[in-house]
Amino acid sequence: MRTLTAHGQAWRLLAAVVACILIFHSPLIFNPGYLSHDELQWAYQATQHQGSAFVNGLWSDVHAFQYRPLTFSLWMLISRQCFDHPFAFHAIIVAAGALNAGLLSIAVFRAGAGVRASFAAGLLFGLGPYATYVHGWVAIIADLIWVFCTLVIALATMRNRHRWLTWIVSLVLTSIALLAKESAVVIPALLALAWFFSGRQRAWAEATVFAAIPVIAYLSIRLQTILMGAPSGSPYAWHLSIIPSNWLKYQLYPVAIDKFGTEGVRALLPIVIVWGLMLLALWRVHIRYVLALLLFGIAALGPVLIVHPAAWYGYGYSAVTAAVVALAWTHMKRWGHVAVSLFACIGFLHSVNLMRIIHDAGEKQSRFSPALAEAVKKSHGSPVVLSVKNEKDRWIYIRMTHDIPSYDGVKMGENVKLAEGSEAANYQVQEDGSLKPLP
C-alpha cells in the first residue's frame, strides 16, 4: 500500500510540475517566430532532403565535428511539420522540457525529499534561466534529449526491480544520448557520483558500468575529432585556462539578470553574496551537500568548461543543483530557506527577462524574414543592404541573416548583408522587424 501511495504521489508530482511549467512558459509557446539562424537553416535543410528525415548520411558521418544524427534528424522531421506553425514547434520543445522537470521531481522524491521540496525542485529546474533558454530556442533539442535519457536511467536505477532492466536502460539510453549530443559522455560520471552519495548502492555501480560501455566506444572513435576538429577561432575551440572562470560563470549565471557572456556582469558583488549564502545554507546542513553540489556540478558541465560558455550548456548542471538543494531543504533552518528562496526568486526574475528577450526576438523574426524574402525577390539579383534603426537589436538581425541559404523558397545567401558604419543601405529594419525602403 505504501508503495502504491508513493507511486501515485510521483504521478501527481509529474502532472503538477508539467502543468506549472506549461503555464509559466506560455509566452515561449506562443512565440510567433524564432530566435536565431539555426531554425531558419534547418527549415531549409528539411525541404532539401528527400525521403524520411531519419534516413540520411548523418548517421554514418562519425568523424563530423558535431556528430548528432538523432538530434539533427529529429529536428528535420519537426521542421517539416511545424516550422510554418511556430506555436506548435515551441509547444513541443516546452513540453519536452516540462517533462524533464517532472521526471527530476520524481527522482528527488524517490531519493527521500518531501513532496513540496520535490515539487519545488522541478520548478527550480524547469523555470530557471538555463531551462528557460533551452525551452525558448528550438536549436537546443540535443540538451533536452541527453538530460531526459539521464533522468530515465536514474529513475530506472532507483526503482531497480529487475537488475537486467537497469543494465539495458543504462546501456541503451546512454547510447541514444550520445547520438543526440557529445555532452552525454558525462552520464557515467553522474551515475558514479550517485553511487558514492547513495551509500555505494550496487544498482548505481551497475548502471555506471553499463553506461560507461557506449561512452568508451564513442570516445575511442570520436575523441580525436572532438579535441582537434573545431575550426580555429570558433566557440568550440578549447582552452584549459578558462576552466576556473567558466566554472564561476555557470555558478553565478542564474542570479545574473543579464545576457550570458557579456563583459562585466552587473553588480557582481551582490550576485556573489546571494550565491555564497545558498552555499553556506547547504554547508550548515552538512558538508556532503556542498560536496554534492560541487562534484555533480563539475560532472554535469564536464567538457563544456573548456569551451566558450553558453547558457544552454548549463541545462544539466541546473538539474543537479535543483536536486541537491531540494534534498537539503528539509534539514535547513529558516535563514537557509530564506537564502535559497532569494536565489530562486532572483533566478525566476532572470527567467522572466530571458522570456521577454526571446519572445521579442521571435516577434521581430516573424515580420523580418518574410519582409526580407519579399525585398530580395523584388531586387532581381541586386544585393539587399540593411541598416538597423535600433542598434541594440543589431544582434538579432546578425543572427537572422547569417548563412541562410533560402527562406520560403527565396534564395538569400550572399544577396543579403547588414550595412557597416556609414555604408549605404536600401532598407532599414524598423523597431518591430519590418523593413522600410530607403531612397
Q: What annotation goes with each model-predicted range?
A:
Residues 2-439:
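Polytopic membrane enzymes that build or remodel cell-surface glycoconjugates and lipids
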